[in-house]
Swiss-Prot record:
Glycans are attached at residue 358. GO terms for cellular component: membrane. This is FAD-dependent monooxygenase ctvC. Its main location: membrane. Pathway: Mycotoxin biosynthesis. PANTHER family: FAD-BINDING DOMAIN-CONTAINING PROTEIN-RELATED (PTHR47356:SF2), FAD-DEPENDENT MONOOXYGENASE ASQG-RELATED (PTHR47356). Its cofactor is FAD. The gene is ctvC.
Length: 473
């Protein structure tokens, strides 16, 4: 480990993508840490895919890990956005990203990413498995974390990287409401909701089909996401709108039988050209059905506890930013810890509070915009409402490469590790963000033509809406 700051120990709860990324960052910063993981292994074979986009990839590049991620991924150059009536259009966002940032669109199994992060962690003895946290207790300027097997760990800061069902978040709320009754109101504790289900899986190659691209199949109340995997295998996701909204923790739980029923019901749905979902389903290797929680909590920290990643920020997989914003949060928090431990004195409670408050406020502002985009895209791709459906089908295809715009825009203004040098691919010479380029527009004339077209479509939609309302009178 590097660094010469005072003795300061971080207890990371959860060997997740967030937790292991933070472990790498702290190692490079010379900060003492331990990772407590409740499962018996660090990278269980859970099967879900994860996308690494430039805002997460640049941090992995700084840590020297991105090249190992690239080695596990199947390259692709475009995204097919397909509709029920047979119409489709392409986004060149993977090619745009590679040209602009030097980073490939990376899609791999979450367990593969965890394996990479763990394998390349210099000191694996700091990652302890079968250590489910049951209690967190403040002791003056120290924190005590108790695990289910009775072990107790002492540290200066506890970081919750333990996912959507976070014990750390629950303990933070408990302690906060003991020390300041009402600090975490019930409204915030009940602010996470579920409106969509998700079946994610992986399939072996489909006979006669090679060289897959990323596919987004848009339909009424559902969305298919297809990602190419190594060896012409496929990652796939089926997202469906649920009959009504659920408030966490009273959310549905799904069995494998539920997943089979839904997938068989979707078997006849077209995916790409002559391939239907039944062809992908027939080659299935593994699958699982879950509820998709959505929320950005407002309170991220209290005292010497802070939550990051899915424990505090949960979105659907539609824009692929869940893991990437979690990686950003790990890097941003590492920057904060590094900064407050460089004056050779133990940071006070007040110093820690101000540092965590500034970090939370800054990162939450960025996440507010990304969450808004995620919620909008999720409902847009599920054709939720006739206005959204009309925009998706008839307006968006003529507005330039909106998909590339979103990816490129979210790649800027994110966190980087301030105590490590930037490389070419982590942003040292990234081109300046110019909005007309991100739209894929080569000429102002083309922009004018598209603007006029879109304005005309909007007027037609408004007239249709007005006529519809008159007819209802």
């Amino acid at each position: 480990m590097e660094g010469k700051g005072p003795s300061f120990k971080v207890i990371i709860v959860g060997a997740s993508v967030t937790g292991l990324t933070l472990a790498h960052c702290l190692h490079r910063a010379g900060i003492d840490y331990v990772v407590l993981e409740k499962h018996h292994e660090v990278h269980p074979p859970i099967g879900a895919a994860v996308a690494i986009l430039p805002n997460g990839g640049r941090i992995m590049e700084q840590l020297g890990i991105f090249r190992h991620i690239e080695d596990r991924c199947q390259p692709f150059q475009r995204v097919h956005l397909c509709f029920q009536d047979g119409f489709y259009y392409d986004s060149l966002s993977p090619s745009v990203v590679l040209k602009r940032f030097g980073l490939k669109f990376a899609a791999l199994e979450r367990t593969q990413l965890l394996e990479i992060l763990y394998t390349h962690l210099p000191d694996k003895s700091r990652v302890l498995t079968s250590k489910g946290v049951v209690r967190i207790t403040p002791h003056g300027n120290k924190m005590s974390v108790t695990t289910a097997d009775g072990d107790e760990f002492q540290g200066d800061l506890v970081v919750g990287a333990d996912g959507v069902h976070s014990v750390t978040r629950r303990e933070m709320w408990r302690i906060a409401n003991i020390e300041q009754p009402g600090l975490i109101p019930f409204k915030e504790q009940a602010s996470m909701s579920v409106e969509f289900s998700c079946i994610f899986g992986m399939s072996n190659p489909i006979p006669g089909r090679k060289h897959w691209q990323h596919i987004i199949r848009i339909g009424p109340g559902f969305t298919f996401l297809i990602f190419p995997a190594a060896g012409d295998s496929l990652f796939w996701v089926l997202i469906e709108k649920l009959p009504h909204k659920y408030i966490y923790p009273d959310v549905p739980r799904f069995s494998q039988e539920d997943a089979v029923t839904r997938c068989e019901a979707a078997a006849s749905q077209p995916v790409w050209q002559e391939v239907r979902f039944r062809d992908i389903w027939a080659q299935r290797r593994g699958f699982r059905m879950v509820a998709l929680e959505e929320n950005l909590f407002r309170t991220w920290h209290h005292g010497r506890i802070i939550c990051i990643g899915d424990s505090i920020s949960k979105m659907t997989p539609n824009i692929g930013q869940g893991a990437n914003t979690a990686i950003e949060a790990a890097a941003g928090l590492a920057n904060v810890i590094y900064a407050i431990t460089q004056n050779h004195h133990q940071p006070s409670d007040d110093t820690i509070h101000r540092a965590l408050a500034n970090f939370s406020e800054r990162h939450r502002k960025r996440l507010d915009a990304i969450h808004l985009e995620s919620r909008w895209i999720t409902r847009l791709e599920a054709c939720q409402g006739w206005v959204v459906t009309a925009f998706t089908r008839y307006v968006a295809p003529h507005c330039g490469d909106l998909f590339a715009l979103g990816v490129v825009r979210n790649s800027y203004n994110g966190e980087v590790l301030q105590f490590l040098p930037l490389t070419e691919r982590s942003g040292k010479h990234w081109p300046k963000l110019e909005w007309w380029n991100t739209w894929g527009l080569s000429k102002w004339q083309e922009f004018g033509e598209r603007l006029v077209y879109c304005f005309g479509v909007v007027i037609l939609l408004w007239i249709s809406w007005a006529v519809f309302n008159v007819n209802q009178l």
